[in-house]
């Protein structure tokens, strides 16, 4: 294989994406090279625009645009009384796609985990508590994964909200142990939401 520094660097970068190894990255790079005008040029332009304009909202953790703000918590035309708490944006997208839930989202940015040195201070938990206190929220749905880290995080949030009047519920235990929200099919998600269990009300 020719040692072209730019190509090698691109392969390394693409290999860092989830689910992609060096072989898959090489195939993607070759596809890009063979379709310079159709893929590389518009992709480079779009990536530059995303880098410049798209950020995580500091309030809810969802994606926001410099020009339009956050459609989840700032510019949402609907006034909801529920917040669904998820670990990451992929979880938010999965639940939105299933159409099982209508309400606000709050994206923590991970879980409390000793294995990767992620503490509660690293997550958007304090801003969740502020949203519950300052907005007309009646229910917080804890939609964390059925992993040790996900359940630990859910328990911590439940404990943090115990002195509020808000209803706290958790997705039904039909979720597979160790299962992550973003990998669940629509049927499982719909069942988990409809049969969610109350921690307190």
Predicted regions and their residues:
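Long C-terminal interaction/binding lobes of large macromolecular proteins
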Residues: 36, 131-201
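Generic secondary-structure boundary/loop-capping signal
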Residues: 30, 70, 83, 92, ...
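Extended interfacial segments that mediate partner engagement and assembly in macromolecular machines
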Residues: 25, 75-144
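Conserved phosphate/pyrophosphate-binding and hydrolysis machinery centered on Walker-type P-loop NTPases
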Residues: 18, 37, 50, 63, ...
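Cys/His-rich Zn2+-binding cysteine-cluster or related metal-binding knuckle/ribbon modules and their
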Residues: 2-7, 16, 26-92
